[in-house]
Amino acid sequence: MVQDATADGVMDASDACCAPPGNVDSDAMATDLQVLSAMGNDTRYELLRRIANADDGVCVCDLEATVGVSQSAVSQALSRLYTAGLVTRRKEGSWRYYEPTETTEVLLETLDDLRGNHE
């Protein structure tokens, strides 16, 4: 939409084509981007799905055997998911176990709903 200037060349605010954009909470946006970025990698996303689909915490040793990447890559991926608040971890003996957070459960359920695959 082209706006016409008044006789003195100044645009009238009432002629604006749309409302100004709303404010964005920069802290919330940074948190959202951290979460989405953590999910935006094939290995991390697969690990997250496997952890969320397990009945109980998943041992890192079991995850390493299922995703087809090095132990180092799995460790880095799990660390990133933990830092983003998508998984919790606990240590039992020499092993770490990972579980999804409530945030993860809601996000994955929402994605399933959007695809129409909610179980």
UniProtKB/Swiss-Prot annotation:
Entry keywords, A to Z: Arsenical resistance, DNA-binding, Plasmid, Transcription, Transcription regulation
Keyword Transcription: yes
Entry keyword annotation includes Acyltransferase: no
CDD domains: HTH_ARSR
Function: Transcriptional repressor for the arsR2M operon.
The name this protein goes by in its record: Putative arsenical resistance operon repressor ArsR2
InterPro entries listed in its UniProt record: ArsR-like_HTH, HTH_ArsR_DNA-bd_dom, Metal_resp_trans_reg, WH-like_DNA-bd_sf, WH_DNA-bd_sf
Induction cue: Constitutively expressed.
PROSITE patterns with a match to the protein in the record: HTH_ARSR_2
Cross-referenced Gene3D superfamilies: Winged helix-like DNA-binding domain superfamily/Winged helix DNA-binding domain
Residue ranges occupied by any HTH arsR-type domain in the UniProt entry: 24-119
UniProt source species: Halobacterium salinarum (strain ATCC 700922 / JCM 11081 / NRC-1)
